[in-house]
Amino acid sequence: MSASADSLAAAASLDKYGDEDIFSLLIRYGLYVGALFQFVCISAAVLMENNPDSQSNPETGEVTEREGEPVRTRLHKIRKLEKKKRR
């Protein structure tokens, strides 16, 4: 029993920082809160369903049907505009 008490005293004497101050506690719990916030944001982005009523942005690369214009012509126009932008 005295050997364990002596080893605890020796371990306590090696601890050069002692008790944690308020700043280290603030940093530790702030990191936990930040990790929780990131987890919530990522899970919301993954699990959130798309709203079917929302209008899609035409610049996202999705091709939608237009009246009287075949799909092949639209794809050609999109590729041509992208090539022109790269110049």
UniProtKB/Swiss-Prot annotation:
List residues traversing the bilayer: 25-47
Give the residue ranges for region: Disordered.
50-87
Q: Where is the composition biased (Basic residues)?
A: 73-87
In the UniProt record, the gene name given for this protein reads anon-73B1
Instruction: Give the family per the record.
Output: Belongs to the UPF0239 family.
Determine if Transmembrane is one of this entry's keywords: yes
Q: What species is this protein from?
A: Drosophila simulans
Protein name, UniProt field: Protein anon-73B1
Compartments annotated for it: namely: Membrane
Query: Which regions are flagged for Basic and acidic residues bias?
Result: 63-72
Keywords associated with the record = Membrane, Transmembrane, Transmembrane helix
- UniProt xrefs under Pfam families: UPF0239
Q: According to its record, how does it sit in the membrane?
A: Single-pass membrane protein
> Main location per UniProt?
membrane
GO CC terms of this entry: membrane
